[in-house]
Structure formats: C-alpha cells, structure tokens
Curated annotation (Swiss-Prot):
The active site is at S159, H186, D279. The gene is cheB3. It comes from Pseudomonas aeruginosa (strain ATCC 15692 / DSM 22644 / CIP 104116 / JCM 14847 / LMG 12228 / 1C / PRS 101 / PAO1). GO terms for cellular component: cytoplasm. One of its GO terms (molecular function) is protein-glutamine glutaminase activity. Its main location: cytoplasm. It catalyses: [protein]-L-glutamate 5-O-methyl ester + H2O = L-glutamyl-[protein] + methanol + H(+); L-glutaminyl-[protein] + H2O = L-glutamyl-[protein] + NH4(+). Disulfide bonds: none annotated. The keyword Hydrolase applies. Belongs to the CheB family. Residues 2-119 form the Response regulatory domain. The lineage of its organism: Bacteria, Pseudomonadati, Pseudomonadota, Gammaproteobacteria, Pseudomonadales. Keywords: Chemotaxis, Cytoplasm, Hydrolase, Phosphoprotein. InterPro entries: CheB-like (IPR008248), CheB_C (IPR035909), CheY-like_superfamily (IPR011006), Sig_transdc_resp-reg_Me-estase (IPR000673), Sig_transdc_resp-reg_receiver (IPR001789). This is Protein-glutamate methylesterase/protein-glutamine glutaminase 3. The modification 4-aspartylphosphate is found at D53.
Length: 335
C-alpha cells in the first residue's frame, strides 16, 4: 500500500513510521505537516491511503478530508491522539468521506508490535475495500417461513460519507414513521455508541445500538454496534456473529442484507448509501431478487460513489435516488 501521512507532530510521524515498518508491503510516499500540504500532495501523487491527523495548523484534518475527497479522492483513515475526545470531529470527517479512525500508536510504551496492531488492521481493511476483493462462497437463499403478520423493515448500509448522509436521511423521517430501521455503518465499535447518540440528536425517532437477540422494532432505529457482523435470524431476531470470517470489514452490509433477503417475513426496503468499495451491492441484489424494493444513492449526492455504483452496475437497485429523496420515498412506501 502506498501511504501518505498528515501530522504536524514529529513524534507522531515517527510512531507511524515504526508501526508501518512491521508490514514491509507498505510504502510511505510522502509526509505533510498540515491539511493544506496534504491537499497539494494528494493532487500531485494520490496514495492508496492517507493517515490523517485531526488537529493541525493552517488546515485541520476535517477540512483536508473534505478537500481531498472533492479534488483527489482516496481512502482516508483518521489517526490522532485520543480519538474518544474528538468523536464529533471524527464523525464530521467521516461525513466527508473518511473511512475509519484509530488512535496514534504509542511510542516507547509496551510492546511496539502490539501498539501498531490496531492501525495495521485498519489499513488491512482499507486494502480489502479498495481492492474490492470478494472472498465469499455462494450464499444459499432459504425461503422465509410462511405466515405471520406483515411487518415493515428498512435496512440501510453506509460506509465512507455515511454519518452525514444518515443524519440527513433520518432527520427527514417523520415521528410517525412506523417501520423498523436497522443501520449498518462501517464504523469501529469504539465510536458506535457516540454515533447512535449523535444520530438520535438529528432524528425525530429514537436511535440506539442494536442488542444481541432482539428483533427490529417498529418506530425505532437500531445501529449495528460491534466489530462483528449483524444478521437477521429465521425467528426474526438480530444476532451479532463473527461468521463469515472471510469478510474482512465488519460489520458487513452484504451479510445483513443477505440475511434480510433470506429470512424477513414482511415488507422491506434496502437502502445503500455512500461508501468505498462494493460492500452491500450483492446483498441489495438478493433483496431485489426476493421482491423487496431496493434503493441506491445517486452519484451526485454521494461523498464516495463506490458501493452504490457497484449496486447500479449489477442492477441491484430498483431506484437510484438523490439523498434528499430517499426519506420521502420511504415515508411514501410505508404510509
């Protein structure tokens, strides 16, 4: 992987250099000391991934992320000291297209390889996304059991740019919206609770983390909240699971959409929002093949037109809509 580093602290840059040295396939192509330099460097030599600090002089990491994704788009991972204290900035950067966030590896404390492991896992996940590898076996579609009340479900998947897009979509849903909503956003479990709280502040409907073993609940929005996949079981409950292990990025949108296609008994809509790579495209296609309405976000309103593009390419979406039109469409379907 060709990697650019954006950080104004020499010790942090050195910590990143040492961490990356554990994986010889990674190459540092440039180092920028502020966001403005990073924008210029990306335009001249776009790397595979940028490791972006948040708090810097001249231009901070949020604005630099916005500029890079608009001018020279590439994978961006936020790497900063104490990300838990900068959650809102992290979400803002993710809204502009950053994929993930992780603490800067500690320098000179404990085992250096152990300290580097979280960052290296994030980079590995990014490699999976931008490489668009598909290591799955064929998923067997099992028809749902007959009978039971017709319940309503909206299954939404998002990645890079997702937090801001989800906020826009959820804000437009009326307080009377009576379908269950389950969100799968590519976000580390460290940020999941904070993201649920933030989305709740933007929504007329309650938003919280999904609990293992509970069913989707009408009028509530549940967010996948761990680093495992979330699936719908035959009995209608949600479960967190490490399987399938072939999916490097967790939680996987495909895993959830496919489980909805297999087991949901009522009416459902699948929605695939902005994101890098192709996660969710095959699952959305399975939902369409089961007769569910499927929607992909259009290119013009996406921060990163990757996952919806992959869905459009395989004819997985019944409708391709701008972000502003998705919530009104959901309200119309479930009126």
């Amino acid at each position: 992987m060709r990697i650019g580093i954006v950080n104004d602290m020499p010790l942090a840059v050195e910590a990143l250099r040492r961490a990356l040295a554990f994986e010889p396939q990674h190459q540092i192509v440039w180092v920028a000391s502020n966001g403005a330099e990073a924008v210029t460097q990306c335009a001249a030599d776009t790397p595979d991934v940028v490791l972006m600090d948040l708090l810097m002089p001249v231009m901070d990491g949020v604005e630099a992320t916005r500029r890079i994704m608009a001018e020279s788009p590439c994978a961006i991972v936020i790497v900063t000291v104490d990300i838990e204290q900068n959650v809102h900035r992290v979400f803002e950067a993710m809204g502009y297209g950053a994929l993930d966030a992780v603490n800067t590896p500690a320098l000179g404390i404990g085992n250096p390889q152990t300290a580097a492991a979280p960052l290296l896992r994030k980079i590995q996940n990014v490699g999976w996304l931008i490489g668009q590898r598909d290591n799955r076996g064929k998923v067997q579609v099992v028809p749902p059991k007959a009978g039971g009340a017709r319940q309503r479900l909206v299954a939404i998947g998002a990645s890079a740019g997702g937090p801001a897009s989800l906020a826009v979509l959820l804000k437009q849903l009326p307080a009377s919206f009576n379908a269950a909503v389950v969100l799968v956003q590519h976000v580390d479990e460290v940020f999941a609770a904070g993201m649920a709280e933030w989305l709740a502040s933007e929504s007329k409907l309650p938003v919280r983390l999904a609990r293992d073993g509970e069913p989707p609940i009408p009028g509530q929005i549940l967010l996948a909240g761990t680093n495992n996949h979330i699936r719908l079981l035959r009995n209608g409950s949600l479960v967190y699971t490490a399987e399938p292990r072939s999916f490097v990025y967790r939680p996987s949108i495909d895993v959830f959409f496919e489980s909805v296609a297999n087991y949901w008994r009522g009416d459902a809509v699948g929605v695939l929002l902005t994101g890098m790579g192709r996660d969710g495209a095959q699952g959305l296609k399975q939902m369409r093949e089961r007769g569910f309405l499927t929607i992909a976000q259009d290119q013009a309103s996406c921060a990163v037109y990757g996952m919806p593009k992959a869905a459009a390419a395989i004819d997985a979406a019944v409708q391709i809509l701008s972000l502003e039109k998705i919530a009104p469409r959901l309200a119309e379907v479930f009126d």
